[in-house]
């Protein structure tokens, strides 16, 4: 306990007036994270003032918006101006759209919004990728045509910084404009209300992607957090911290990164364990962030939809995408797949629409061939599953309707298909993908497994614990949540203090940025 008090005292000393400049200044190499001690101390102060303003609507909106902009500044520096520009642009476009009577005029406003939003996203995220492709094509043409000037073209990437969370808030603003166009929501009258929605800090930099029709009505309600909701929010924050700080960061730094940095130095069984480790790492990292975002929002009186639902328990690839990153998969379905025609244009067109949707979903994650192939893999898998479901009636039962033995087999097949995709997702190059697969299929050496258990005890234990927690029944998770929810406030405060202590302890080992910050 003395060690805990000393750590807290040390941290408070770091938050003295002498360090105030550091707190207010953006540091490129140290963006603010939910899993950082700094965020927790800032949030506690923010929450106290927030609750005192709960009956003052406009003041509360301005206060939260300013804190959200500060939070984004601490994550991306002066790119908060870009966030404000995108928000202002789409707010004005939605206002103009409602004053336009003709259908084609309204469509023109939607097109303008897409051009602005996707144009900015394309520049910051894909411009270098497109230049690299163009340089490669020019070089190949020069070789074929014997043109030395074309052959001598080399690719030099521009120094373009990717604003944190641009893919997430761009999708949010696009969905708002489209929903206004479709008549599903009325446009907001006040600019500050829309900026509040776009910049709301719990989900700003890595989701979940929140729909305007779900979020905006909650802005105008007086935030009332019951004891049960406070306990639920605290439970989600604690779960997210454990997933991220204890499991994801540890197995990443101590095993997974080593495997993917040099696959040929390890046997096939170690490479396979590295893939299993990354599957757990990315789940704990991203779902951990989502848990914290949902929990923090709940502590502020806002309820978000679940973003992850034990995805590795899925028995089919279709079920996986109903459980993994639910806010993105539902967004792709509602605003891309259905807009392409969905399943209304015939069987072949349905398969093509699935493939296009997942290809663009892969490209959304990153500008590289490996992400495109990852999206293509999932698109083909979804199309194949739909084909099987349509032509073989014995495969139609899903979920709890499946026979237990079939569900076990389905979970194993789906999990390993997803893991194969994670190799594409994690590898720095296609060469690394080839090396990992080569080691797994030609240099397996299963006897090395026991050496892994002995040599990486901490990694092995955390991987076992992580997968057990993931596959445990929902009732067990609800039971754990009930323990936290029903605990006295003093016990909950102790739990939060312990969580902060864990964050401070692990900070010395280097808290890693969330994986989805790069998207």
How should these model regions be labeled?
Residues 2-518:
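Membrane-embedded transmembrane alpha-helical bundles that form the catalytic cores
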């Amino acid at each position: 306990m003395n060690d805990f008090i000393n750590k807290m005292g040390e941290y408070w000393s770091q938050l003295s007036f002498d360090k105030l400049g550091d707190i207010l200044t953006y540091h490129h190499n140290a963006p603010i994270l939910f899993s950082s001690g700094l965020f927790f101390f800032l949030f506690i102060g923010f929450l106290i003032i927030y609750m005192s303003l709960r009956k003052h609507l406009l003041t509360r909106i301005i206060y939260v918006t300013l804190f959200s902009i500060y939070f984004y500044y601490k994550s991306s520096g002066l790119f908060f101006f870009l966030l404000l520009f995108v928000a202002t642009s789409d707010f004005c476009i939605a206002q103009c759209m409602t004053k336009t009577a003709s259908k084609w005029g309204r469509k023109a406003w939607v097109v303008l919004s897409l051009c602005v939003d996707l144009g900015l996203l394309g520049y910051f995220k894909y411009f270098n990728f497109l230049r690299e492709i163009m340089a490669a094509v020019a070089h190949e043409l020069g070789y074929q045509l014997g043109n030395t000037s074309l052959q001598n073209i080399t690719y030099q990437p521009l120094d373009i910084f990717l604003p944190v969370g641009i893919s997430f808030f761009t999708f949010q603003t696009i969905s708002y404009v489209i929903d206004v166009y479709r008549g599903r929501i009325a446009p907001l009258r006040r600019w500050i209300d829309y900026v509040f929605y776009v910049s709301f800090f719990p989900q700003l930099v890595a989701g979940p992607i929140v729909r305007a029709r779900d979020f905006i009505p909650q802005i105008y309600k007086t935030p009332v957090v019951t004891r049960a909701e406070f306990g639920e929010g605290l439970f989600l924050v604690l779960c997210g911290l454990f997933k991220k700080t204890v499991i994801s960061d540890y197995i990443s730094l101590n095993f997974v990164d080593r495997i993917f940095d040099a696959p040929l130095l390890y046997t096939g069984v170690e490479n396979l364990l590295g893939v299993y480790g990354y599957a757990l790492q990315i789940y704990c990292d991203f779902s951990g962030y989502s848990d914290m975002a949902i929990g923090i929002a709940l502590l502020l009186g806002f309820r978000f939809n679940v973003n992850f639902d034990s995805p590795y328990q899925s028995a089919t690839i279709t079920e996986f995408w109903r459980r993994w990153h639910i806010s993105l998969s539902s967004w792709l379905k509602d605003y891309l797949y259905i807009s392409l025609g969905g399943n209304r244009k015939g069987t072949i067109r349905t398969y093509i629409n699935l493939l296009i949707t997942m290809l663009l979903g892969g490209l959304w994650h990153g500008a590289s061939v490996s992400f495109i192939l990852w999206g293509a893999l999932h698109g083909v898998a979804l199309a194949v599953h739909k084909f099987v479901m349509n032509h073989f009636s014995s495969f139609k039962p899903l979920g709890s309707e499946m026979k237990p033995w079939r569900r076990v087999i389905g979970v194993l097949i789906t999990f390993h298909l997803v893991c194969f995709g994670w190799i594409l997702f994690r590898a720095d190059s296609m060469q690394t993908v080839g090396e990992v697969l080569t080691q797994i299929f030609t240099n397996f050496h299963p006897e090395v497994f026991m050496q892994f258990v002995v040599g990486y005890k901490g990694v092995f234990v955390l991987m076992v614990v992580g997968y057990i927690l993931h596959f445990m029944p929902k009732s067990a998770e609800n039971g754990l949540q009930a323990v936290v929810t029903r605990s006295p406030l003093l016990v909950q405060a102790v739990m939060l203090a312990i969580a902060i202590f864990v964050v401070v302890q692990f900070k010395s080992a280097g808290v890693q940025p969330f994986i989805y910050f790069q998207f």
